[in-house]
Amino acid sequence: MPLSVEVIVNGGSGCVTDGVCDEIASLFADAGIDARIHQVDSQNIDEIAEHVAAGNSDIVIAAGGDGTIGTVASALVNGPKSLGVLPLGTLNNFSKDLGIPQDVPSAIDIIAANHTVRIDVGNVNGRHFINNSSIGLYPRIVRDREKLQRLGRGKWWAAAWAALRMMQISPFLRVKLKLDNDELARKTLFVFIGNNAYEMDLYNIGRRSRLDRGVLSVYLLRGRGRWGVISMVIRTFLGLLRQTKNFEELQTDELTIEMRRKKILVATDGEVSMMDAPLRYKIEPSALNVIVPRSE
C-alpha cells in the first residue's frame, strides 16, 4: 500500500514560485506516493497543520522555511505521525542540520525512503521550537525588518537596516537566569536558547551536529556596549566566539528567565510574538518523529 502524505506549502516562502505545487505533486506521483497538497497563507499554517495532524495520512510534510517547518512540527509533537521536510525557505537551517538535500527532487527521494529518527524539541511557555528562541536584539530586528518589508523594502535590505537601527537604540536587558539550582543575574543585549548545541568553529558556525542530546544551549553576551557586540560579530565570522571573554555558553534541560517587565518580545524559529514573563524554557527529548537520510 503506497504511503499517504499531506503537504503543507507556505505560499509566501522564499522559493515558492508559480507551478511549484504541481511540480511537488508530480514528483511524489513518480515516487509512487499519494500526496495531497495544501498551499496556504502564512497566517493559516497552524490551523491547517492541526487539521492535517488529526487526519489519516502517514506523513505530514512542511514545504517552506524554518518558520513554516516549526509550525507544522508543533502540531506533530508527541504524536504518531512523521514530519517530512521540503526546504523552500531562505536559510533552511533545520533541514541543513538534518542533512536533508536542498533541492526538492532529492528531498522527495529522502521522504520516499521513509527513514525516521526521533529528535528533541524546545518549549517556551508552551510554544515549541525546532531551532532556537531568543529575546533582546534579534526579535526586535525581526520586528523592524517585517515593518520595512510591508513598506516594500527587500528582505535583506530591510534586515540590514533594522540591525543597524537596533545597534543604535537597543537597550540592554537585565535578566535573572534560573537553571540547575543556580541563579545568574546578567546585563545583556540578548539571550539565545538553542534546541541542542550550536557549532562555533569557522567552517560550521551556526550548525548543529545532533538534535537528540536532550539539552538546551544558552548563549549570551554580558554587557560591554555596542562595540562589544560588533567585536562579537567579527569573532563569530572568524570562528573565535568561544574565546570572547564576555560571551557565555550554558547547557541545561530547563531554564527560567525573569525580568522586571511583564511582557517581552520573543523570537521562536524566526517568528516573533509577545509573551508573558517569566519565560519558562524546557527541552522535550525525542518528542518529534522526522524523516532524514540514512546514515552512511
Locate predicted features:
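Glycine-rich phosphate/pyrophosphate-binding beta-alpha loops
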Residues: S134, F192-G206, V272
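Catalytic core of DAGKc-family lipid kinases
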Residues: I8, T17, D22, L27-A31, ...
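Short Gly/Thr/Asp-enriched flexible loops that form oxyanion-binding sites at enzyme active sites
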Residues: T68-K81
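ATP/nucleoside-binding phosphotransfer catalytic cores, i.e., glycine-rich phosphate-binding loops
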Residues: L179, A185, R210, L220-E296
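N-terminal glycine-rich "phosphate-gripper" loop used for MgATP/nucleotide binding
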Residues: A62-D66
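Short aromatic-hydrophobic micro-motifs that form the base-stacking/packing surface
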Residues: I61, G84
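ATP/NTP phosphate-donor binding region
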Residues: M1-V60, G70, E296
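Gly/Ser/Thr-rich active-site loops/lids in small-molecule metabolic enzymes
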Residues: Q149-W157, L202-G228
